[in-house]
Structures are given as structure tokens and as C-alpha cells.
């Protein structure tokens, strides 16, 4: 039911939080005339809007249709646009047109609007309208399909969803130079003003792929040979053909197509085929859809493949192909066979994950991931955590219905390309299958849009029924079959993650445990490679779920902002009770859950400390930071990963154990990984933490207030500590080399020699401002 006029007026008053002149006419409702003393409009700036050159917003009498307008100031930089926005719930469903008056002194070429709607704040961006110099009215049709979203892979052709639940309204200016444009009289209209400027028409291509609708029983099935020479531990893609046609090729009850692979030693692998649609780089369907199978041979020699249809029962001619040995291949990631607290490849090499969350892209997906992966790989990174969320790579949402992924083939193809980018750069993907918001009504809630919700045509009255309802479970098993068939063959799939932070949903551990057991059995049926499984909570170590044999390793998430050394050490001990000897990772880390303060912490101290604290407190890799797209990448913080990678290169951590260290001052903390003849040491000043930064900042502000002076530009410099002594115990007596490393400068220092006596090594640090690491190795 639509709101009445006075309800709309109240919403707008809340939006602007200032007196608003609202004029109800037959054809218009004025949203903002900018006649008040203040405005809630703001410039979109980095890190949240890293692609925006917006500078400031100011009320002005210049170029106003009434007494005042608002000036939107920007610069012309390498960023292509300037974003200005207001955030507050608005109902924009009352009229079909959004109009405003704009004066352009000649500093802007185009303008577009963007609306974030619904509980997930889905960003809808319009086509842009060309601007002339001088005064003009600009109009946007709110009901048309000239918008693009992440759901449409940023291709125009979708309408705005949930106009009545608009959370953010933004103007996107395309500058031609430094300056400003002047905005006034923002309004909803039922008819477009004569002579108004409107967006340029965009071409919305008609897909060339024809959806499968009719049915025909299969009488033939065939399999094509590999298009490229097959190599051990390299995934193959084989084409399949059948004359069978079904209404839904994603439903194996309608057409169950599998391929039986037989290895040189007689091992049999039954792999499900999947329905595939190729796309062009412009994300348009490329040719007709069809069947494929993906498989990674683990043995060299002669293999046999044969396609099989279950109903009707048909088999193809057997195909024989040769697989060449691949001595350089490391294989799949496993739990380390010699030390279950770490990971290893099939060939025995240690896998030490260094990376971060790169969960999704809200821009040009492939360009973003190529840039992120290039920068991560160039700095020694080798892991990324990616979500199959509704706005990114999910196969099933309210635009698909349940069990038919036809409308999400673009997302599947994009995820193919992301895997390819990762494989080319030595990056391994933790693939998160379910995000909490999809089944939450409180934290990042998306339940109202979930296709399993009875309100949207599903079968579930409550989110927690997803893990108990038999129909929902069977539909999810169908999705798992498709996911396993399409991506399970990749050796660069590090792990399947069932849920992200499930504690934000109403699903309890008692409900979850049998579901994980059932779904793990299902997924391993479809992918025989032995991939690892994990799961996550918003904290970490307290749940008995970690004891389940179906979960390969445990995860800690932390946004407390506390010192990672103490937080990680405490959580690690907690995992001893719940996870046994399983590996542990810090799967998410941030200073806060709401964002990072770049201006307060330009050195990214929390990112740095998290990366180093995790392995030195026993975790199997560096902590995986969150804010990748609005903090790490726009501020070029990638080199922090290189320091960790350089220091731990070629280290066999399976022979070392996290060990207490004695430090001569309370102003520093030291942690070590130690064996009998080898130790790795990290010493950090306690002044090099975000807590110390915040405390120093607060003191500086108080001092300025007390002195009644203006608080100007401020930058934190950690205090310098002098003559610190560190003692390691438990080493065998003898001569040792000590090689120092600066994690912040990413450089090696001098090598020195010490003598270990009575099992104790004493190291002296003349001065310490941030942190130092060292390798202590016995001289042969």
C-alpha cells in the first residue's frame, strides 16, 4: 500500500532534518528547495567513494531558483566522476519522474542519478544526461529500465527495485574541469517538464541465447575430446552434446548427465555435467548454451571418459585421452600431514595463506578483480575470500526463482573468469557459499527478498527453516551439485565455506550441525578432490561445531579494534578446546565493523599488526583483512602483504611452535615461533597500535581545547624505545646467527652472531619505534 501525501511529507522532513518547503501540486512534490540553514547533502569521498572527485557541498545564493541553491564542488582528476549524496529513507514511488534544476557554468559534461534501495541498499545507476552550459531542468524516469546494478553485471536494462524503500539518493557529475554545479528544486513529478534534459538512450541488447522451454526425450549423448593437451593437476573442460531437451537444465530430475572418468590405475570418478552459457567481455551471451564437464586428472597416463544419461539410460562412445606428467604442479590444498595445524599441497609443500577478503565487486567486476589480484600477487599474496552473495556471484535469488539459474549465468561466467585470474596469479580462493544477510532479519537483512521466503513465493516462514525444511534442503543440494560441477575441479579452490557469520541468523548450532553433516556428504559426492571445508561466526572459538569431522579448519573473525596479539592468542587457546588440532585462520579482521579511519591511521597499523600477529600466535596464515575496496586498494596498502611474504618465504612452520618470550620492558611485546635449533621472532612496540594512536589523538584534542587553540593537522609518531632485551628459552646450546628484518620498511638488516647458553638466547635491540622481526638459526 502506498503512503499518502502527509506520510511522504514526514519522510522527507526526516530525510532533511531541517525545515522543508514542500509544495503539493497536481504534477509535482518538491523534495528539497534548499531554503533551510543547513543541508544533509554531502560529497562522496574516498575511501568509501574512491572513484569520486567530489570536494564539498555548500548552500549559496548563486544561481538559485528561490533564495538559495546548493553548490556541488568537484575537481577534474583521473577519477571519472564526482558523487554527491544524501542518505535517509525516502519513498520515491509516489511519482514517475525525478526532476531538478541545475546551473552548469561549463564545468560538467553529464549527470546521472543513483538510488540505493531495499534492505540491502542495492545500487541502481541511471544512464547519464548530457548537460549544456547555463540553466536547465534535468529529468529522470524512475519507472524505466535504463538502470544498471551489480545484479545486471552493470549492464543497462533493469528498472529500480523497491523505489518505496530508497535509502540513498546520489547525483553523479562527469566533470570537464575544476569547479561546481548548482542544484535546486529537487522534486517528483507526474509528467516531465517541457524542454527538460533527459538521459541518453542506451541500447539494451536482446540476448542471443534462446532459453530452453520445450522438452524432448534424449536419444543420443556424446563427449568431445579435450580442446588442449591434458596435464596432471590442470582442470579440463570437455563439451557434451545430447538431443534431449528439458524445461530446466539445472534440475537433474529432468536430465541427469554425468561423465565417468577412469584413471590409468583404475580409479573411477563420476562427475556431474553442468549447463553453460558463454559471454562476451561486454557481458552479452556468446553463442548458444550447452553442456560441459570439468575434471582435474590427478594421475599421468591414459584416461578414459564416457558420458552417461540416467533417464533414459544412455552412454556415449568411450573417449581415451592422454595426460602428461606435471612435475611443477603442487596439487590441491590439504591439511598438512605432518602438522595438522597447517596446510600443505599434495606434493608436500607448505601452503601459508597470505591475503584478504576480496568478497565482491560493485564496479567493473573483471577489471576490479584483475587489478586486485595483480596487486595482491605482486606483493606475495596467495589467498582471497570470495562470497557467493546475492549482489555478486550467487546462482539463486529473487531474479531467478528456486532451482533455475538461467538468469544468473552471467554471474557464473564472471566467477569462472575470477577463478581463471586467480589460477594465473597463484591465488587460492576460499569460496563462501552462504552469507548471513540472506537469512537474517536484523544484521544486513535480506530475508525479505530471499526466494525461499514464503512472502516471495518460497516455502519458508522463518529463516531458520532453511536448514530443517526438506524441500529447501533438496533445492540447496541441487545448487551444490551445480557449484561442485562448475568450480570444484579447480586446484585453486582453497576451501568451501558453508556460512559467513551464521550467528547473525536465527539458525542455532543444534540446527546447523546435522545440516553441515548432510550437505558436506552431498558436496563431496559431486566433487572427489577432497577440498577443505570451513565455516564462520562473527567471533570464533566458542562453538562446539568446530569439533565436527566435516569441518577441516576453524576461523576467527574480529572487529574489536583490540591488540591482535592478545586477541588472537586468547582465541587460539579457545580453539584448543573446540577445534582440537585443526588449523585456524583469522578469516576477517577490521579495526571496526563500520569502516577504517584512514586519516587517523594512514600507516594501516591494525592491518599490519593483524598480518604479523596471526602466524606468531599459531594461526596457519596471516589475518585476512576486510575493507579491500574502500581502504586497502584505494590507499595502496598492498605492500604490507609483501613484508609478511618475504619474511616467511621458505620457512617450514610445521617444525615450530608458538612460544612465550620475555621482554625487558612493558612498552613492547614479543612473540616467537620456535623449534630446538630455529626460532622466528617478532617484537613490536606497544606504541605501535591503533589504541595508542587513538589515545594520543584524544590527548592532542584535549590539549588544544584546554589551550583554546585551533586543532590543526596532526600525525601520530610512535615513541622510540631504547635498549630492549629479549630472551628466548628452549633452544639447544651453541652458536646462532640472528638476521633482523624491518616489517614496515620491508628490508633486511645486519646479521649478527650470538651464543645460546643453558637453552637461553639473549637478543638486544638498541632502539625500537614500530616493530622488528628476526630469524634465529643455529650455525651448522
Functional labels for PLM-detected ranges:
Residues 256, 312, 329-553, 557-565:
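Active-site mouth of glycoside hydrolases
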Residues 25-50:
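Extracellular carbohydrate-recognition regions
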Amino acid at each position: 500500500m502506498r503512503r499518502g501525501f502527509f506520510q511522504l511529507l514526514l519522510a522527507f522532513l526526516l530525510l532533511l532534518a531541517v525545515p522543508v518547503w514542500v509544495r503539493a501540486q497536481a504534477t509535482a512534490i518538491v523534495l528539497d528547495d534548499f531554503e533551510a540553514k543547513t543541508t544533509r547533502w554531502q560529497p562522496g569521498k574516498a575511501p568509501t567513494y574512491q572513484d569520486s572527485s567530489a570536494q564539498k557541498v555548500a548552500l549559496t545564493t548563486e544561481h538559485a531558483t528561490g533564495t538559495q541553491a546548493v553548490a556541488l564542488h568537484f575537481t577534474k582528476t583521473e577519477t571519472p566522476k564526482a558523487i554527491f549524496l544524501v542518505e535517509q529513507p525516502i519513498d520515491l514511488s509516489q511519482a514517475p519522474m525525478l526532476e531538478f534544476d541545475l546551473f552548469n557554468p561549463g564545468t560538467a559534461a553529464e549527470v546521472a542519478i543513483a538510488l540505493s534501495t531495499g534492505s540491502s541498499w542495492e545500487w541502481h545507476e541511471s544512464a547519464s544526461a548530457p548537460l549544456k552550459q547555463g540553466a536547465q531542468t534535468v529529468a529522470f524516469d524512475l519507472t524505466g529500465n535504463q538502470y544498471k546494478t551489480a545484479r545486471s553485471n552493470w549492464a543497462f536494462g533493469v528498472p529500480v527495485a523497491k523505489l518505496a524503500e530508497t535509502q540513498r539518493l546520489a547525483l553523479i557529475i562527469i566533470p570537464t574541469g575544476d569547479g561546481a554545479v548548482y542544484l535546486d528544486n529537487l522534486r517528483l513529478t507526474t509528467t516531465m517538464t517541457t524542454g527538460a534534459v533527459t538521459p541518453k538512450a542506451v541500447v539494451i541488447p536482446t540476448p542471443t541465447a534462446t532459453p530452453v522451454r520445450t522438452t524432448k526425450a534424449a536419444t543420443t549423448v556424446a563427449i568431445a575430446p579435450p580442446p588442449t593437451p591434458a596435464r596432471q593437476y590442470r582442470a579440463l573442460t570437455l563439451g557434451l552434446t545430447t538431443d534431449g531437451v528439458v524445461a530446466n537444465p539445472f534440475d537433474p530430475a529432468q536430465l541427469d548427465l554425468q561423465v565417468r572418468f577412469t584413471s590409468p590405475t583404475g580409479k573411477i570418478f563420476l562427475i556431474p555435467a553442468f549447463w553453460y552459457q558463454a559471454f562476451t567481455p561486454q557481458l552479452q551471451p556468446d553463442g548458444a548454451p550447452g553442456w560441459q564437464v570439468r575434471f582435474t586428472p590427478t594421475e599421468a597416463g591414459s584416461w578414459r571418459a564416457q558420458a552417461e544419461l540416467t533417464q533414459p539410460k544412455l552412454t556415449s562412445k568411450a573417449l581415451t585421452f592422454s595426460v602428461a606428467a606435471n612435475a611443477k604442479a603442487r596439487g590441491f590444498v590439504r591439511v598438512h600431514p605432518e602438522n595438522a595445524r597447517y596446510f600443505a599441497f599434495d606434493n608436500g609443500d607448505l601452503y601459508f595463506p597470505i591475503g584478504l577478503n576480496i568478497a565482491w565487486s560493485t564496479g567493473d567486476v573483471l577489471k576490479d578483480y584483475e587489478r586486485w589480484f595483480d596487486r595482491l600477487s605482486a606483493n606475495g599474496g596467495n589467498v582471497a575470500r570470495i562470497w557467493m552473495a546475492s549482489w555478486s556471484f550467487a546462482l539463486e535469488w529473487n531474479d531467478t526463482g528456486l532451482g533455475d539459474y538461467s538468469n544468473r549465468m552471467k554471474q557464473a561466467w564472471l566467477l569462472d573468469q575470477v577463478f581463471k585470474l586467480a589460477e594465473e596469479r597463484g591465488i587460492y580462493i576460499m569460496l563462501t557459499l552462504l552469507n548471513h544477510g540472506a537469512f537474517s532479519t536484523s544484521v544486513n537483512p535480506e530475508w525479505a527478498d530471499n526466494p525461499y521466503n514464503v512472502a516471495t513465493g518460497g516455502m519458508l516462514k522463518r529463516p531458520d527453516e532453511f536448514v530443517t525444511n526438506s524441500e529447501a534442503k533438496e533445492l540447496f543440494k541441487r545448487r551444490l551439485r551445480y557449484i561442485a560441477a562448475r568450480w570444484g575441479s579447480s586446484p585453486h579452490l582453497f576451501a568451501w565455506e558453508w556460512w559467513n557469520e551464521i550467528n547473525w541468523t536465527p539458525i542455532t548450532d543444534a540446527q546447523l550441525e546435522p545440516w553441515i553433516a548432510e550437505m558436506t556428504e552431498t558436496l563431496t559426492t559431486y566433487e572427489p578432490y577432497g577440498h577443505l571445508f570451513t565455516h564462520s561466526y562473527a567471533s570464533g572459538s566458542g562453538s562446539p561445531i568446530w569439533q565436527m569431522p566435516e569441518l577441516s579448519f576453524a576461523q576467527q573473525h574480529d572487529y574489536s579494534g583490540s591488540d591482535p596479539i592478545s586477541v588472537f592468542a586468547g582465541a587460539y587457546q579457545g580453539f584448543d578446546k573446540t577445534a582440537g588440532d585443526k588449523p585456524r585462520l583469522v578469516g576477517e579482521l577490521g579495526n571496526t565493523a563500520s569502516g577504517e579511519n584512514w586519516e587517523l591511521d594512514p600507516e594501516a597499523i591494525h592491518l599490519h599488526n593483524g598480518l604479523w600477529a596471526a602466524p606468531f600466535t599459531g594461526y596457519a596464515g596471516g589475518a585476512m583483512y576486510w575493507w579491500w575496496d574502500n581502504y586497502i586498494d584505494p590507499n595502496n596498502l598492498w605492500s604490507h602483504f609483501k613484508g609478511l611474504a618475504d619474511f616467511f618465504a621458505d620457512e617450514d612452520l610445521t617444525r615450530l611452535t608458538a612460544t612465550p618470550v620475555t621482554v625487558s620492558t612493558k612498552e613492547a611485546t614479543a612473540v616467537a615461533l620456535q623449534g630446538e635449533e630455529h626460532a622466528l621472532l617478532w617484537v613490536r612496540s606497544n606504541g605501535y597500535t591503533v589504541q595508542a594512536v587513538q589515545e594520543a589523538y584524544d590527548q592532542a584534542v584535549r590539549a588544544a581545547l584546554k589551550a583554546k587553540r585551533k586543532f590543526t593537522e596532526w600525525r601520530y609518531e610512535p615513541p622510540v624505545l631504547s635498549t630492549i632485551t629479549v630472551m628466548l628459552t628452549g633452544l639447544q646450546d651453541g652458536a646462532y646467527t640472528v638476521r633482523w628484518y624491518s616489517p614496515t620498511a620491508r628490508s633486511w638488516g645486519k646479521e649478527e652472531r650470538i651464543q645460546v647458553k643453558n637453552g637461553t638466547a639473549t637478543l638486544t635491540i638498541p632502539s625500537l619505534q614500530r616493530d622488528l622481526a628476526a630469524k634465529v638459526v643455529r650455525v651448522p
